[in-house]
Amino acid sequence: MSRDELRIVLGAMIPNMEEGFEIKTRDGAILRVDPEWECCKEFKDGLKAEIIKQLKSKPAVVFGYS
């Protein structure tokens, strides 16, 4: 995942999860996740932490050098 893609996730996906989100299962069923569920809060916090960790660990791109 590129740095820009991670920024999109941080800027768009995470805030939209405040109202809950949907998960599509392999059999096609769609489950609505309530944002007040404790596991939902833990999932969001874990996802944020992982994305930020990946952003910080990825070296910055320097243009003009190969």
Curated annotation (Swiss-Prot):
<comment type="function">
    <text>Involved in the depression of host DNA replication.</text>
</comment>
<protein>
    <recommendedName>
        <fullName>Protein dhr</fullName>
    </recommendedName>
</protein>
<keyword id="KW-0244">Early protein</keyword>
